[in-house]
Amino acid sequence: AMIQAVKDGQFDVGMDGITITDERKQQVDFSDPYMVSQQFMLVRADESRFASAADFKADEKLLIGSQAGTTNFYTAVYSVLDGDKQNPRIKLFETFGAAVQALLAGDVDTVLMDASSAKGYIGANPDKLKMLDEALGTEEFGYIFTPGSDLTAPFNAAIKTMQDDGFLNHLNTRWFFLYDANAK
């Protein structure tokens, strides 16, 4: 919905962990990447039936919660399961939050997400969730702009400056990897 809204000019810029892909580049303009992320399996803290994507794939009773059309969905389809987008082992949700709630409730057995998002959910549910160690894919996140936007170049300049002086790495570490949702 966000990509279409920016493409249609409802918004000048969009940013929400949007993965840079060739398909999306046909719809909107992207900034240079501001973050590189990897996909992991978020599971319940007591999960012992599987410890890898291969283990998960082998047990046909296990289900993945995902949001259609996202990088996480395509990672589930192609890196965990059999390449079939209609695979009944993928249960679709409107939001990642809803998929995580289904995971917590036991309705699905894993939700794929980037490490920073997974750590946020784990921080909010420290005794209920964990992340498996196996990285399943790498993606780059970028800001999106209405095609032909004059904002792309200034955003790229700002990203480059923050990369060069280390500030972007500091922000990513501070807010995505050291953040404690339970801190007062």
Identify the function of each model-found stretch:
Residues 6-7, 56, 103-104, 143, ...:
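Hydrophobic residues within well-ordered alpha-helices
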Residues 16-27, 75-79, 104-137:
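A ligand-binding cleft/hinge motif common to bilobed small-molecule-binding domains
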Residues 59-69, 93:
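Short beta-strand->loop
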Residues 71-90, 130-131, 160-184:
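Ligand-binding clefts/hinges and TM-proximal coupling segments of bilobed small-molecule sensing domains
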